[in-house]
């Protein structure tokens, strides 16, 4: 299908409308100009893991398992922990000594909720603020089918200081994370409701219901005190956000979801279970890559494990990998010889998975006619909420 702006639909500025004995110069039209280059969309990804990394001094007998590279600037050498990132050293910047000023007073076990918010939970009765990924999601709202992709190994929201999501809406409320690969795939790439007319009626019904809710809430607000008015305003704002989502869903309902190649499908292991960490984490990364590749969303977060105790799904990963203790216990042994190596091996596992994701992003063009790659157009934050316990 031809598009305005393509070479086959450009007019020279000297073109004329010609009639019988008449030649009328055309006014400047958009189609006369050459097609302006379309800027490749930017993307944001945030990947988080808890409980610190293996910190080893140069004189330590386990120095090779120290997380931070040797040297500074561009002249550095990866230790065993981050060696899998060697192929991407030109695209990777390793930063240390950073912290959220407002989070320094919070206990090390309680800082996972603040990775993307930097919020002082203690002074706000454990009520968070909006996460940076959701600020970006609002910026891109409507440009993609989904504003963001929020994932975690444990799924849901968890509880304050033990959150199982990285993402918080504009009111500081946690956004439930998805953790079932098949569920994520169906939402982003599945056929959806086979009866489009029924789906359209459902969306229309939802819109009508929201109109009634807004009307009733507006009447109620006028009879409330100042504090309750603030609460109802917050509620109304939430309803408006739902309205916007319904409106966007109506706009996208007749647009087919992106198709995937056989090779893309073969890489996915949608039956991957969190009891097999290597397959599970790889699949979550692959889903993130596909979401970016198809421009289904431009914002994604993945919490590999939470700050919860040893019973969490992600917390069991080291044991399932045969590295040693559960993640919490592993972190507490960081300053012991055996513990330093075990924690370093966990760090390396994470780096291997991350490196594979970077490979996929680097080998995928940012667009059909683009010389850039997805990695070129994506800011990726990969890190944790504390150095050591």
Language model features: what each stretch is:
Residues 1-387:
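Ligand-binding pockets and gating/stacking loops
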């Amino acid at each position: 299908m031809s598009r305005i702006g393509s070479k086959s639909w450009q007019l020279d500025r000297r073109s004329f409308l010609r009639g019988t004995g008449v030649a009328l110069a055309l006014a400047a039209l958009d189609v006369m100009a050459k097609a302006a280059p379309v800027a490749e969309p930017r993307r944001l990804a945030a990947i988080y893991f808890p409980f610190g990394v293996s910190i080893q001094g140069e004189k330590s007998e386990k120095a090779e398992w120290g997380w931070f590279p040797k040297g500074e600037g561009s002249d550095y050498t990866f230790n065993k922990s981050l060696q899998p990132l060697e192929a991407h050293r030109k695209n990777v910047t390793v930063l240390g000594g950073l912290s959220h000023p407002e989070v320094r007073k919070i206990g090390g076990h309680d800082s996972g909720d603040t990775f993307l918010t930097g919020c002082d939970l203690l002074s706000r009765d454990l009520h968070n603020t909006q996460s940076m990924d959701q600020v970006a999601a609002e910026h891109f709202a409507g440009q993609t089918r989904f504003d963001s992709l929020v994932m975690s190994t444990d799924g849901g929201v968890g509880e304050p200081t033990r959150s199982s999501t990285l993402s918080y809406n504009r009111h500081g409320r946690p956004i439930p994370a998805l953790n079932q690969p098949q569920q994520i795939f169906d939402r982003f790439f599945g056929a959806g409701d086979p009866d489009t007319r029924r789906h359209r009626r459902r969306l229309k019904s939802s819109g009508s219901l929201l109109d009634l809710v807004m009307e009733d809430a507006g009447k109620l607000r006028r009879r409330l005190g100042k504090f309750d008015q603030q609460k109802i305003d917050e509620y109304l704002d939430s309803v408006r956000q739902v309205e916007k989502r319904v409106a966007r869903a109506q706009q996208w309902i007749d647009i087919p979801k992106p198709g995937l190649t056989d090779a893309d499908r073969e890489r996915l292991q949608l039956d991957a279970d969190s009891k097999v960490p290597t397959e599970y984490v790889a699949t979550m990364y692959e889903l993130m890559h596909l979401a970016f590749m198809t421009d289904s969303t431009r914002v994604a977060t993945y919490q590999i494990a939470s700050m919860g105790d040893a019973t969490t799904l992600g917390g069991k990963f080291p044991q399932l990998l045969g590295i040693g203790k559960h993640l919490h216990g592993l972190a507490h042994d960081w300053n012991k010889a055996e513990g330093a190596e075990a924690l370093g091996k966990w760090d390396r596992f994470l780096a291997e998975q991350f490196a594979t994701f970077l490979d996929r992003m680097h080998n995928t063009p940012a667009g059909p006619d683009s010389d850039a790659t997805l990695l070129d157009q994506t800011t990726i934050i990969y890190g944790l909420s504390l150095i050591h316990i």
